Swiss-Prot record:
Active-site residues, Swiss-Prot/TrEMBL: D290 (proton donor)
Gene: ubiD
The protein's Enzyme Commission number: 4.1.1.98
Oligomeric and partner information: Homohexamer.
NCBIfam families assigned: PRK10922.1 (NF008175), UbiD family decarboxylase (TIGR00148)
Co-factor note (free text): Binds 1 prenylated FMN per subunit.
Binding site for prenylated FMN: I178, Y179, R180, R192, W193, L194, R197, G198
Name of the protein described by the UniProt record: 3-octaprenyl-4-hydroxybenzoate carboxy-lyase
Keywords: Cell membrane, Decarboxylase, Flavoprotein, FMN, Lyase, Manganese, Membrane, Metal-binding, Ubiquinone biosynthesis
Annotated positions binding Mn(2+): N175, E241
Organism: Yersinia pestis
């Protein structure tokens, strides 16, 4: 499966630079708004990753737009092309539910996958680059880091690519998650994690098991791309994100124990924040411009107190912005879409394709095409999408079409909706379900509705009427006109080029 290898973020940046996928910016650029404007224009034009070498007021460079194209997401996952991410999805589908060998020959066919799994354990180091420089106690000062202030009405600078490491009281494996963090002071951040996310669940279980005790937390900034992407990929609960990252990267993930707690962090991370959450210590977070294209409302979240900052020599701060699509999360959604397809097909073999349009804010709308097999089949698929992977818990709209429709072509999808749907019969509405708290359109924060659209051809059990047959030209006629077409010269060369 692996087609390219790299060891850490710096190794990956060297690879990008060799391929013209990284632009160094030497001019002084302000982390307050200016970096966002440059990064946004670059991303919308399909441009390179950006390394701001001289942020105004800081000596630490800032990396933006690392995953600003689907191609770079694929490269981060060890692949040369986005289409190869289907293989990553197939491997994940296998790891979620491995099929037992059906015989001796089948065992040999499956051996490569089993070998990949065996090569995934992490490698623990006694010392690591991420601990080359250490600040602790009164020396901890987050203002040394050029944290971006992305939008004019944002409440404060925002750490956007913080890889947060936690462990529940009853778990051996750690959880890795990406949660945005508002800078609150020289040693304090607000940890914005939603209640269903792994870090929040670990914290909740800790509070129940250890009332009044501090909850250990570590945040890695500038981890290698495979580890970052593993944290946002539907890795099976029985598998460590570190282990899966090793598989993507082509060699084992190297980790090191924190100085102040027992959590293990990526050894090659550029910066690591160590600390704790004091139970009951909450603060209002926001507002912030978000991936929806709007400022979100203010809500209370736990405060993360930083006791240690460790970093590499000449550390790089990895950052991003979020805004109306396309932004980095939307681009990543397009690439990771290819990972989701085989996982869904493993559970629902009737699925032909699955698409999360980037303009749907990464995950809020999904289009599914199926080989329909019975009346009501589309509704079963809708329910399956909403319940199978936690990544789709907040998907508000699911459109199900037949396999003659291209899920990635709005012309096809809209045609199916307008010709194969009766709004009353073919619309499924579900009320009072979990919804993204950032979705201000829902009547209650965190609780809203979902809509399923059955845009499939209807079977006799679904309608008493004779169903329409799509118009299609006679194939012999098409072949004759194909042979005659150039001779007709209906379009001039100028028209053809246009």
């Amino acid at each position: 499966m692996i087609s390219m290898k790299y060891r850490d973020l710096r190794d990956f940046l060297s690879l990008l630079e060799q391929r013209g996928e990284l632009k160094r910016i030497s001019q002084p650029i302000d982390p307050y708004l200016e970096m966002t404007e440059i990064a946004d224009r670059t991303l919308r034009a399909g441009g390179p990753a950006l390394l701001f070498e001289n942020p105004k007021g800081y000596s630490m460079p800032v990396l933006c737009n690392l995953f600003g194209t689907a191609k770079r997401v694929a490269m981060g996952m060890g692949q040369e092309d986005v289409s190869a991410l289907r293989d990553v999805g197939k491997l994940l589908a296998f790891l979620k539910e491995p099929d037992p060998p059906k015989g001796f020959r089948d065992l040999f066919d499956k051996l490569p996958k089993f070998k990949q799994v065996l090569n995934m354990p992490t490698k623990r180091l006694n010392s690591a680059p991420c601990q080359e420089q250490v600040w602790q106690g009164e020396d901890v000062d987050l203002s040394r880091i050029p944290v971006m202030h992305c939008w004019p009405e944002d409440a404060a600078p925002l750490v956007s690519w913080g890889l947060t490491i936690t462990r529940g009281p009853h778990k051996e494996r750690q959880n890795l998650g990406i949660y945005r963090q508002q800078v609150l002071g020289k040693n304090k951040l607000i940890m914005r994690w939603l209640s269903h996310r792994g870090g929040a669940l670990d914290y909740q279980e800790w509070c129940e098991a250890h009332p009044g005790e501090r909850f250990p937390v570590a945040v890695a900034l500038g981890a290698d791309p495979a580890t970052i992407l593993a944290a946002v990929t539907p890795v099976p609960d029985t598998l460590s994100e570190y282990a899966f990252a090793g598989l993507l990267r082509g060699h084992k993930t190297e980790v090191v124990k924190c100085l102040s707690n027992d959590l293990e962090v990526p050894a090659s991370a550029e910066i690591v924040l160590e600390g704790y959450i004091e139970q009951g210590d909450m603060a209002p977070e926001g507002p912030y411009g978000d991936h929806t294209g709007y400022y979100n409302e203010i809500d209370n979240f736990p405060v993360f107190t930083v006791t240690h900052i460790t970093q590499r020599q000449d550390a790089i701060y990895h950052s991003t912005y979020t805004g109306r699509p396309p932004d980095e999360p939307a681009v990543m959604g397009v690439a990771l879409n290819e990972v989701f397809v085989p996982i869904l097909q493993k559970q629902f073999p009737e699925i032909v394709d699955f698409y999360l349009p980037p303009e749907g804010c990464s995950y809020r709308l999904a289009v599914v095409t199926i080989k329909k097999q019975y009346a009501g089949h589309a509704k079963r698929v809708m329910m399956g999408i909403w319940s199978f992977l936690r990544q789709f818990m907040y998907t508000k709209f699911v459109i199900v079409c037949d396999d003659d429709i291209n899920a990635r072509d709005w012309n096809d999808v809209i045609w199916a909706i307008t010709t194969r749907m009766d709004p009353s019969r073919d619309t499924v509405l579900i009320e009072n379900t979990p919804i993204d708290y950032l979705d201000f359109a829902s009547p209650v924060s965190g609780l809203g509705s979902k809509m399923g659209l059955d845009a499939t051809n209807k079977w006799p059990a679904e309608t008493p009427r004779e169903w329409g047959r799509p118009i299609k030209m006679d194939e012999d006629v098409r072949a004759r006109i194909d042979a005659l077409w150039d001779e007709l010269a209906i379009f001039s060369d100028k028209d053809a080029k246009r």
